[in-house]
Amino acid sequence: MYRHDQRTVMTLDAGGTNFVFSAIRGNQDIVETICLPAVSDNLNGCLTVLKKGFSAVKRQLENEPVAISFAFPGPADYKNGVIGDLPNFPVFRGGVALGAFLEEEFGIPVYINNDGNLFAYGEALAGILPSINEELKAVGNPKRYKNLLGITLGTGFGAGVVIDNCLLTGDNGCGGDVWICLLYTSPSPRD
């Protein structure tokens, strides 16, 4: 699908422990990965790590990047690039316009999405799902799969759901996540 796209995009997988920076072109990594410790309790420290990581990636590039795209835990206002109220990142409590900050810093568009969603969508469009469907086709089996549940395990626990090749995002960007479950320790007044 994107194998022939020659645009360069800087990437980040933002985990609770590490920030992993890279760049892709034609659906392939094109630079050495840069792994920096995540800073979750100091906003200036976190922003400095983000600038440092993307700047280090940019120095490795032969061509100017056209965008920054990265995966961040949720929930968040991904569409507007605002990260806030994450259990593993108290530094973002109340909301931080991370997308706008990075757009101003690097002068290119910034796209942020949920890490579980991006994992699942990538596997559905260009990963395991097309591979399975190709294997089925090769042996003459007419069955094809278009649905996928992707689970991510790291510092946190995330998930993404793809149904009929469409990503289920929900109202907070975490439609497939099971990031929080309510535990009632006392009976409900209705019981």
Can you say where each PLM-predicted feature lies in the sequence?
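Hydrophobic alpha-helical segments and helix pairs
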Residues: 141-171
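Gly/Thr-rich phosphate-binding beta-strand-loop-beta motif of the actin/hexokinase/Hsp70
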Residues: 2-27, 152-163
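Conserved small/polar residues in nucleotide/adenosyl-binding loops
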Residues: 184-191
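Residue-level structural signal for beta-strand termini and adjacent loop
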Residues: 35-36, 89, 173-174
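Glycine-rich phosphate-binding loop and adjoining helix at the ATP-binding site
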Residues: 39, 43-44, 67-68, 76-147
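Hydrophobic "anchor" residues
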Residues: 18, 29-30, 83, 167-168
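N-terminal phosphate-binding loop and adjacent alpha-helix
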Residues: 30-64, 82
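A short, polar/charged loop-to-alpha-helix boundary motif
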Residues: 174-183
